[in-house]
């Protein structure tokens, strides 16, 4: 029996964040008749500091901190995040309660002049702010110039259209959700550019309150949850933040969980890869096993060098 009549969602103000929050609002109101859901839009530090690469100012956690403070202060009941922005650790009293169904997890190649990444001429300028993409692009195409690109999806597309870049790389999920799929020139296969941990999935964080957890439970997608938990366990075991060249992508194949992961030097000079399979129920164990394979190859040395810079 539901006693709660209303629920407040903390969200960032970017168009994509608002799309995600409205998606969760619509799902909740459809499932729970009579529940009134309101959005509490907030500005985060990551939205304000746009002239500095994320890795230098504390990484993706900057998009989450203010929302978590709103939960802890009781100003909101749940927070909706892109899973790839969610840090590995949660403040005391908060939890990741729900992972919703994943959109396309691949990276999108967006260009007004070229059809694919491999068609770009030598010396072409490619925009991405992600060290994960940077290291994989540099290994694939060491002849390209990779320049930093920050801002929301609309801002990034405008910079491309202004001629600042020959191409930019964005998460396909964001473009699809914003109704901008026509801007996707081509999708980059995961064998060429392995996605970020949690890419394409929406997660819901809340206080550790049974009533709220029950409200959110129907929104969980079991398949996406298993995949993202495996990816995050791998990242956590490597003690990888969001601002390091770590990639991880799991799928369910023939009833088993299949996880691929990599750790790379930012310049693409070395990329370590590992993969593994397990029962779907053993997602977190699989993540740790794959991380161990990377550590045996020397992943910790690459990461220590990055952290010391």
UniProtKB/Swiss-Prot annotation:
**PROSITE patterns membership:** PORPHOBILINOGEN_DEAM
Described function: Tetrapolymerization of the monopyrrole PBG into the hydroxymethylbilane pre-uroporphyrinogen in several discrete steps.
Q: What does the record's miscellaneous section state? A: The porphobilinogen subunits are added to the dipyrromethane group.
| One GO CC term, this protein | cytoplasm
Gene for this chain = hemC
Q: For this chain's UniProt record, which GO biological process terms are given?
A: protoporphyrinogen IX biosynthetic process
This protein is called Porphobilinogen deaminase
- MF terms per GO, please? hydroxymethylbilane synthase activity
S-(dipyrrolylmethanemethyl)cysteine: residues bearing it: 242
Q: Which cofactors are reported in the record for this sequence?
A: dipyrromethane
Question: What pathway does the annotation place this protein in?
Answer: Porphyrin-containing compound metabolism; protoporphyrin-IX biosynthesis; coproporphyrinogen-III from 5-aminolevulinate: step 2/4
Subunit and interaction comment:
Monomer.
Q: Broadest EC class?
A: transferase
The entry sums up its family as follows:
Belongs to the HMBS family.
HAMAP family associated with the record = Porphobil_deam (MF_00260)
Q: How does the cofactor attach, per the note?
A: Binds 1 dipyrromethane group covalently.
Q: What is its EC number?
A: 2.5.1.61
InterPro entries in alphabetical order: HemC (IPR000860), Porphobilin_deaminase_cofac_BS (IPR022419), Porphobilin_deaminase_N (IPR022417), Porphobilinogen_deaminase_C (IPR022418), Porphobilinogen_deaminase_C_sf (IPR036803)
Q: Which domain of life is it from?
A: Bacteria
């Amino acid at each position: 029996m539901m006693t709660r009549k209303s629920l407040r969602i903390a969200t960032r103000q970017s168009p994509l964040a608002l799309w995600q929050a409205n998606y969760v609002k619509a799902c909740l109101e459809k499932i729970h008749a009579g529940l009134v859901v309101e959005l509490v839009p907030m500005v985060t530090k990551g939205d304000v500091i746009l002239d500095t690469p994320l890795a230098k100012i504390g990484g993706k956690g900057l998009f989450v901190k203010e929302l978590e403070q709103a939960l802890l202060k009781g100003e909101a009941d749940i927070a909706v995040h892109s899973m790839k922005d969610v840090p590995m650790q949660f403040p005391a009293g908060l939890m990741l309660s729900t992972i919703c169904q994943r959109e396309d997890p691949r990276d999108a190649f967006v260009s007004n002049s070229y059809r694919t990444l491999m068609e770009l001429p030598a010396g072409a300028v490619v925009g991405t702010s992600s060290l994960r993409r940077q290291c994989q692009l540099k290994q694939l195409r060491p002849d390209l110039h990779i320049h930093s690109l920050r801002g929301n999806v609309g801002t990034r597309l405008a910079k491309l259209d202004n001629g600042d870049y020959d191409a930019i790389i964005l998460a396909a999920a964001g473009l699809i959700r914003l109704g901008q799929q026509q801007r996707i020139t081509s999708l980059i296969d995961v064998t060429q550019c392995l996605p970020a941990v949690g890419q394409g999935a929406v997660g819901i964080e809340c206080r550790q309150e049974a009533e709220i957890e029950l409200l959110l439970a129907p929104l969980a997608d079991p398949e996406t949850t298993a995949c993202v938990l495996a990816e995050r366990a791998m990242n956590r075991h490597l003690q990888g933040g969001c601002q390091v060249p770590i990639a991880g992508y799991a799928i369910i194949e023939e009833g088993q969980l299949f996880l691929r992961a990599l750790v790379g030097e930012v310049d693409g000079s070395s990329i370590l890869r590992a993969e593994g399979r397990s029962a779907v129920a053993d997602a977190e164990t699989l993540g740790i096993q794959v991380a161990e394979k990377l550590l045996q190859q020397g992943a910790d040395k690459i990461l220590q060098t990055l952290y010391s810079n």
